[in-house]
From Swiss-Prot:
Comprises two domains: an N-terminal domain containing the nucleotidyltransferase activity and a C-terminal HD domain associated with both phosphodiesterase and phosphatase activities. It comes from Burkholderia orbicola (strain MC0-3). GO terms for biological process: RNA repair; tRNA 3'-terminal CCA addition. The keyword Nucleotidyltransferase applies. Mg(2+) binds at residues 21, 23. This is Multifunctional CCA protein. Magnesium is required for nucleotidyltransferase activity. Nickel for phosphatase activity. Residues 232-333 form the HD domain. It catalyses: a tRNA precursor + 2 CTP + ATP = a tRNA with a 3' CCA end + 3 diphosphate; a tRNA with a 3' CCA end + 2 CTP + ATP = a tRNA with a 3' CCACCA end + 3 diphosphate. Belongs to the tRNA nucleotidyltransferase/poly(A) polymerase family. Bacterial CCA-adding enzyme type 1 subfamily. CTP binds at residues 8, 11, 91, 143, 146. InterPro entries: CCA_bact, HD/PDEase_dom, HD_domain, NT_sf, PolA_pol_head_dom, PolyA_RNA-bd, tRNA_CCA-adding_enzyme. The keyword Magnesium applies.
């Protein structure tokens, strides 16, 4: 039997970027031969094995045939006579359909095996499908979009984009389960240039099907004195890219993506103003998170950011009492780490605007100082001094926090 390193590892090696994961294909072997050599079977739909020492995945060479809609609708064929070229032919993109042989010692040996000219597409910075079988797996639309966020200088080949549009028009994208959609969006958000993912999804029509709330933002104008970029969709992409550039968490990046959803439903007769868009954003965000099964950490931060980002931008005008009420609404007193992420998302919002990516955001430091002062109040000591009257305790603690914030910032209550 022969072992080959395939896919992303070869692509990344040729691009000169760090190889994160290695996938291996075994040609000429049976499952019984693999287990006899100590490999542990883990695949459900087709034979995948873990190496006894490295725990890396090794899959038997296989072909696949579409049998039903969606990305689960495949029948796999694996046998010792399946060739490497046949295995590579089922892959999505030419740049992922390359291989190199692996020696018994585990080293890569020999030339790059490249039956579909993936190296030429790497040099041209092009995402190109291997064959028309690309249309059989709708996940590939999301994967190309995610790759675009990682390799921002690549473009999608015209013929590949045409196939993606056909898949969307045929309803293939609608067969994806929510968890897989979220998984790919989340991975794309964590890449260097998330806006490229959404550009590709918009270009093929997929974004309107999987996250219509975000797709609706393009073409919606904002006031140019606040938003020189004007277009809401452009603004949101700038915010997400700023958050990515700063290395912020997935929760912050998702909050950046969804903070202005309500602007997509602003009545046309009041544009470019967006009074009340924060509450509309919250109402759109709740079902979106439920539909995509967004994890609680990302959902909860996104809801707070959507509701409060306008208030955070205005904190320089707030008195101490208003600041404490903001802390109470956002649960900052109990969850200061999440409040720090709220600040990151709002800073990204302020700087994700044309020509304003380096503008000062003094609101963040003011809120950090104010929150530290509010949290310094000993609520337990106040409670012990009052007794069992819950309402009196609550009022006294609130007053003490207001006074502490006023003193720390040298402002009125």
């Amino acid at each position: 039997m022969n072992i080959y390193a395939v896919g992303g590892a070869i692509r990344d090696e040729l691009l000169g970027v760090p190889v994160q994961d290695r996938d291996y294909v075994v040609v000429g072997a049976t499952p019984e031969q693999m287990t006899a050599q100590g490999f542990r079977p883990v695949g459900k739909d087709f034979p995948v094995f873990l190496h006894p020492q490295t725990q890396e995945e090794y899959a038997l060479a296989r072909t696949e045939r579409k049998t039903a809609a969606g990305y689960h609708g495949f029948q796999f064929h694996y046998a010792p006579d399946v060739t490497l070229d046949e295995d590579l032919a089922r892959r999505d993109l030419t740049i992922n359909a390359m291989a190199r042989e692996v020696s018994p010692e585990g080293a890569l040996v020999g030339p790059v095996i490249d039956p579909f000219d993936g190296q030429a597409d790497l040099r041209a910075r092009v995402f190109r499908h291997v064959s028309d079988a690309f249309v059989e797996d709708p996940v590939r639309i999301l994967r190309i979009a995610r790759f675009a966020a990682r390799f921002a200088d690549f473009t999608v080949a015209d013929e590949t984009l045409a196939l993606m549009r056909r898949m969307v028009d045929a309803g293939e994208i609608d067969a994806l389960v929510p968890e897989r959609v979220w998984q790919e969006i989340a991975r794309g958000l964590m890449e260097a240039k998330p806006s490229r993912m959404f550009a590709v999804l918009r270009d093929c029509g997929a974004l309107a099907r999987i996250v219509p709330e975000v797709d609706a933002l393009w073409g919606v104008p904002q006031r140019a004195d606040y938003h020189p970029e004007v277009d809401t969709g452009v603004h949101v992409m700038m915010v997400v890219d700023y958050a990515a550039k700063q290395g912020y968490s997935l929760a912050v990046r998702f909050a950046a993506l969804t903070h202005d959803l309500g602007k997509g439903t602003t009545p046309a007769d009041v544009l470019p103003r967006h009074v009340g868009h924060e509450s509309r954003s919250v109402e759109l965000l709740k079902p979106l998170c439920e539909r995509l099964r967004v994890p609680n950490e990302s959902r909860d931060l996104a809801l707070v950011v959507a509701r409060e980002h306008g208030n955070l931008h205005r904190v320089m005008e707030m008195g101490a009492a208003a600041l404490v009420r903001l802390f109470e609404r956002s649960d900052a007193l109990r969850k200061p780490a999440r409040f720090a992420e709220l600040l990151q998302a709002c800073e990204s919002d302020a700087r994700g605007r044309l020509g304003l990516d380096a503008q000062p955001y003094p609101q963040a430091e003011r809120l950090r100082v104010a929150l530290a002062a509010a949290r310094s109040v000993d609520a337990g000591a106040i409670a012990r001094g009052i007794g069992n009257d819950t309402e009196k305790i609550k009022e006294a603690v609130h007053r003490a926090r207001v006074q502490a914030v006023a003193q720390a910032l040298a402002i009125g209550e």
